Amino acid sequence: MSAPAPKADIPGALCPSRPGDPRGKLRIMSQPAKNQQKDGDLTGLRKGEIAVELPAKFDASLYFIGRIRTPWQTRDECPKNGRETEEVCTIELDPRWAAGLQGLETVSHMLVLYWMDKARRDLVLQSPRHYAEHRGTFALRSPVRPNPIAAAVTRLKRIEGNKLFVVGLDCMDGTPLIDLKPYFASTDSAPDASVGWHSARKR
């Protein structure tokens, strides 16, 4: 009897690896948010915003290595950025990656990369509420972007097992975690950095 045909990849599922797949026994497929707009959806656009049709397929897959626990259940509850809050949030790392934390307890600050899974992904021109003019997606720090990856420099309070307690996050509870990196002030800081349109807005 011939072997049954493999099932199609299901978003969000843990799928057996394909023969010869070097990534191991399980592959984690990314899962679209339940309330995410469909590709190229014109609903919910503000005046002047432009949405495009998203590519038919992804070029790479991600492993979500954990979840972020915060006090905020909706986007409106979240602080505008992590420096506006002193709330201690918890990063729950999947136990399989726990050995990767060795040495991280010695750092004071770390860079947290996370996936804004509730954000739409098809806008190329946006009209942010707090800006009078339209801006291109890549000129903004908005979570709305083709790949909704967010980055935050956080202050590490302590590590307990596979849980990290940090200050400086601004995301909703349950946000998927992509990566953790130590923050090096010597190479990661750019004191002379500027964003011209933002500086002009403050004048």
Go through each PLM region and give its residues.
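Small-side-chain structural scaffolding
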Residues: A3-A8, A13, G66, A150-A152
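Glycine-rich, low-complexity intrinsically disordered segments
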Residues: S30-V153, K157-R203
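Intrinsically disordered, low-complexity serine/threonine-rich segments
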Residues: M1-A3, D9, C15-I28
